[in-house]
Amino acid sequence: MTRFRSLALLAACVAAPAFAQMQKGLPPPAATPSTASSRFAREAANGGMSEVELGRLAVERATNPAVKAFGQRMVDDHSKANVELQAIASQAGIALPGQVDAKEKQTYTRLAALSGAAFDRAYTDDMVKDHKADIALFEKASRASGDSAIKNFAADKLPTLREHLKMAEEAQASLGK
């Protein structure tokens, strides 16, 4: 019995390197995205989808031309960024949400109930606050993400987000007090 175990052990030791060599032709398993990268991608996707929905609402409801133009810019820029993020997330094995979360739905519902100057004011106030938070989120991801594609995406979008903040502040200022 001891001799049988010894032979079985020897056979396993000899076969293991041969089996390992056969496996070299297979692609390595996909790296699991870090929790921070996944969280960033999901938050960015949620925010991006919300920006598009709210931008469309602004195009329909805004009475101030600067607010209306800002809304259209949000639709254009965030639609493009959402497509880019989806491709990066898919490559990294990160599942993104298909719709905005409950908080963003509440924001939409609240703004959709407004019209005229009240809508313009509330929308621009939200966009200023939201873009400040977006910039902080993207700055953190551009420095600390463990996934280089996510890190580069965040860094590449920062100038656009800063421009959006400036535009939102200008639209807000055009409304007066």
Task: Indicate where each model-derived feature is located.
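His/Met- and acidic-residue-enriched segments that coordinate or traffic transition-metal cofactors
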Residues: 2-7, 18-177
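Repetitive helical segments and hydrophobic/amphipathic motifs
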Residues: 12-14
